[in-house]
Amino acid sequence: MNDLQLSAELALFLTKLPSEPGIYRMLDEEGTVLYVGKAANLKKRVNSYFSKQNTGVKTRALVSQIKSIEISVTRSETEALLLESNLIKALRPKYNVLLRDDKSYPYIHLSNHPDFPRIELYRSKKKPPSGNFFGPYPGVAAVRETIVTIQKIFKIRNCRDSYFKARSRPCLQYQIKRCTAPCVHYISPENYKLSVEDAIRFLQGKCQIILDALAERMKQAVNQLNFEEAAVLRDQIKNLRLIQEQQGVVQLRGDADVIAIEVRPGFACIQCVTIREGQVLNSQSFFPTVPYAVLDEELDANSLWQQTFEAFIGFYYLDTTERIPDLIITNQSITESRSLEYILSQRRGKSCKIQVNPRGVKSRWMDFAVNNLRISVAEYVSKHSTIRSRYQALKQLLALDKNIERMECFDISHTQGEATVASCVVFDTEGPRPSEYRRFNIEGITPGDDYAAMEQAVTRRFKRLIDAQLLPDVLIIDGGKGQVSIVKRVLTSLGVEDITLLGVSKGPSRKAGWEKLILVNENREFVLPEDSKALHLLQHIRDEAHRFAITAHRKKRQKTRVESTLESIEGVGAKRRQALLQRFGGLRELAKAPLEEICKVQGISEQLAKRIHEHFHP
């Protein structure tokens, strides 16, 4: 043991640890979990933290806070790794490498519709629907781009089932040749199924299998003199070959993931390149939060690299065995490579190898991954140095003693008092936190009363924040002195102190750069120069709050107008309105519908159908 003063209880606990696989949780004096780890031998691993040889900065900082340790014995290392991964996701301990919850990364989802499956972007923390999932992808843009590619080549529908059922004629997707209009039976379930199977193979990287199948189907179509179908298949082959050329095919059997990692002070970057059947299928960047900001010792840098790699293995591979490849290639040796190989192979049901710094063809993959890694790191550093400098400028402007860790901004949106919505956006030292944004539907106020709307939104928000103990350091209000004064009164009534309240008023010209800032705590108003970094940060937050508010307002206004339009027709209540919208997909389509189609809607009599039709065609 080192010179750390251990309690008698903890010292005794260390001597009685079992020599079995399992996980351990290190807790501070308040019972907060500081770190979660796994071990093939709990006794050896946990005691190693208190060894004199363990001199790492991060380890010393961690050990100094440990007041108790909890363990869970598992039947195998595989079970330990799974449990460790799940606990890290659930508890998000301070000293673990933290990857963003994989449920917040976007996936491609192919539904399990019996005849005509739908392709869509899926990202939710709710229980996922049944069907096939592909991903995760690094961002929404990558998913949307892939879906568009699949629609262009394989023409898979992307409309909601309710819209699909209600169609009586093809939609715009058919007109622009991204769908085969299965809604009106322009394609048989059998042929659509072939397209879906090809799309799945495409997402799995099996392009050559698709090309061979398409070539055979094109040959059959020509022999049957079905030249129209042959032309469609020819275009699919052409587009697929173009994608293959862009991806750079390498003649090598098997699948591989190439993982390059760089650990820097304050963050790490993981570049994962997916190779399937010799071609680059995907390249993604992940930026986990590292547990310690200062890496001034080689030991800490190496141990964090190892921890980052293991965290990524748990995050990326253990939830779904379909993602585990034949080979994982890395740019640095792995301390527990054999153990990880065994765990992944056991989970997969067949061999998975880990290879370090490969030669030959595989080295080109690593070069590709490392090159992308450098670009990703450079972009991250550039972006976050700008964010940090802006935060520092705002801190100096507001003369704050502590760093700004969290800011929130409120805005109100309505159209002459109609469909009033308040938005709340959240920023931290990483920038915007969209998952924490909130919208508030404002009810029970005089239409157009922005003061009452702001009062209601801030009251509702801060009652929740007080309970969660998650108050911002700076609260920004998009509005003038009157709105800011209302918010100040709300905070005082709730007993909220130590928050810097700042108003951002657009000024008489309402032009960017002429904003007037209202600092309530000091009872002063001022205008910043256009090149002020603090002003740029405030403009960014204010604009994001405005965007979020106006988007919510437009959706609410549209919904309200649809409801009021239909319910103004005698005989149309909530149930019939819903039936009409489900059948036609929207008010615009209903307005275009002929009388015969309206009569087909369940619950709509011929007389009522005439009344509805005459409402839109007086």
UniProtKB/Swiss-Prot annotation:
HAMAP family according to UniProt: UvrC
Chain's role: The UvrABC repair system catalyzes the recognition and processing of DNA lesions. UvrC both incises the 5' and 3' sides of the lesion. The N-terminal half is responsible for the 3' incision and the C-terminal half is responsible for the 5' incision.
Domain of life: Bacteria
InterPro entries linked: GIY-YIG_endonuc (IPR000305), GIY-YIG_endonuc_sf (IPR035901), GIY-YIG_UvrC_Cho (IPR047296), Hlx-hairpin-Hlx_DNA-bd_motif (IPR003583), RuvA_2-like (IPR010994), UVR_dom (IPR001943), UVR_dom_sf (IPR036876), UvrABC_protein_C (IPR050066)
Subcellular compartments: Cytoplasm
Domain UVR: 208-243
Entry keyword Cell inner membrane: no
Family of the protein in this entry: Belongs to the UvrC family.
UniProt keyword terms in alphabetical order: Cytoplasm, DNA damage, DNA excision, DNA repair, Excision nuclease, SOS response
Subunit structure: Interacts with UvrB in an incision complex.
Protein name stated in the entry: UvrABC system protein C
Annotated GO CC locations: cytoplasm; excinuclease repair complex
Alphabetical list of Gene3D superfamilies matching this protein: 5' to 3' exonuclease, C-terminal subdomain, GIY-YIG endonuclease, UVR domain, UvrC, RNAse H endonuclease domain
GIY-YIG domain span: 19-97
Any one Gene Ontology BP term: SOS response
Lineage start: Bacteria, Pseudomonadati, Pseudomonadota, Gammaproteobacteria, Legionellales
Molecular function, one GO term: excinuclease ABC activity
